[in-house]
Amino acid sequence: DRDYEDGLRYFQDKYPGTMAARIEFDPALSQRMYAAADMFLMPSKFEPCGLSQIIAMRYGTLPIVRETGGLKDTVIPYNEFTGEGTGFSFSNFNGDEMGDAVFRAARLFWDNRDAWNQLVTQAMSQDFSWTRSADKYLDLYFFMHPEIERPAAVVDEPVVCLLYTSDAA
């Protein structure tokens, strides 16, 4: 949305050295930005999966996301009463809610650095690996097929399966 882009550029010009906005994508710059930033704003209107918020969390950059698709599935909103969470979120696609989420994140950053650091640790410790995904898949599979007993041992070494299909009849 052009209005948001212009707004971000305005604040970049108003606060040089403190705030920066890059609308284009540059892979080399993106890694440096993830590593240097404290917060990562991802206000997607639609996002089937989203990797950027996962990358941000791995770097210790807390995501601020709109609750849609994979963003809602991967970012746990910060709960100031329990300390749980991995980032910040907002529900509706509008500037007021987005601004409120950014304000909540900034307030925590400036007013409670211990809670902020704990939230960063929680975000960085999230497991989005294939091992976790495969284990969830197996849980579902064995739940749907109770007649099949799930093996107790888990293999820590990689397993390679080769499937061969032949066109020959």
Predicted feature residues:
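Short glycine/serine/threonine/alanine-rich loop segments
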Residues: G17, T61, F128
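C-terminal alpha-helical cap of glycosyltransferases
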Residues: W130-D156
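Nucleotide-activated donor-binding/catalytic signature segment of Leloir-type glycosyltransferases, i.e.
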Residues: R2-S30
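Conserved small/polar residues in nucleotide/adenosyl-binding loops
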Residues: Y164-A169
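A charged, aromatic-enriched C-terminal amphipathic alpha-helix characteristic of glycosyltransferases
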Residues: D111-D139
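Catalytic binding pocket for nucleotide-activated donors in carbohydrate/polymer assembly enzymes
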Residues: R32-Q118
